[in-house]
Amino acid sequence: MIFNPNLQINIQYRHILEDEGNLERMKSITCKNLTSLLRGEIEMMKMKVSANYKLAVPQYYQHKIQLLLPLCLEDGKTPDMALVVSKSDSGKYYQGHTCLTLEIAYNNARLIAKPESNWLVP
């Protein structure tokens, strides 16, 4: 599966920003408006992935192929989280599910193959 940057990503911001597990994973990020930060970073990530499709790393979870997309929330340069997305059944958009630490994302991606992307390292 190759990421299509022209498709919209529907994000479950409430789940991502109110879920205890996600908040724990993002505890080092200091920002008063995480929703705005996340929205801006998702737009930046889409531009980066459109320039280099290998940044979108596949993972297999709950009988589906999903993509892990790098998010650089702390400094805007170094990935510190992975956004999990899957293509909708209609194929018209991606559904953003959650954010994972890089360690969890790497372990999930390894179930398919060793990730070729240089942002997702153990």
Where do the language-model regions lie?
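An acidic, glycine-rich, mixed-charge low-complexity segment common to nucleic-acid enzymes
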Residues: M1-Q62
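Compact beta-sheet-dominated globular domain cores
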Residues: K64-P122
